[in-house]
Amino acid sequence: MTTFVHNDLDVSAANVVASGQPLYPAVERTSAVAAIANHANSSPASAEQRAAIFADPGFGKYFTDNVVRAVWTKSEGWHQAELVSGSASAGGLGINALHYGQSIFEGLKAYRHADGGIYTFRPEANALRFQRSAHRLALPPVPTDLFIGAIEALVRQDQA
């Protein structure tokens, strides 16, 4: 089991927590998370379409070709993770129920560098924030392995 801690100070909820102190109950990292099944979009945006989108991306205007979704049950926790077409989500990714219902948003960007590699910055910190948000909303926290595995699967698919 790994205890997740914040690197700096946390001033949220009028609580200052010194560096190195657990912020929330430990969330177990599981090595039992199965590989993410790949059912990617068979007709993703073309290079020209992507270039136009990246020139003026906006917010909530364009959606990704693919998403990772998983099922949660009390008996198994998070399981059946799969990369699927973004349009495969019921009603699409822009529906109000998804954005105004009880949900969590955690932003993370992956950047391509001059050496051709793709980098993210501290995805473990994003996973921790996502877990903390889940605790606040009484939702089951997503294990760090699954969170980062989903990011890796999406980045691999998008660079293909």
In which residue ranges do the predicted regions lie?
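Conserved alpha/beta cores of soluble small-molecule-handling proteins
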Residues: 2-160
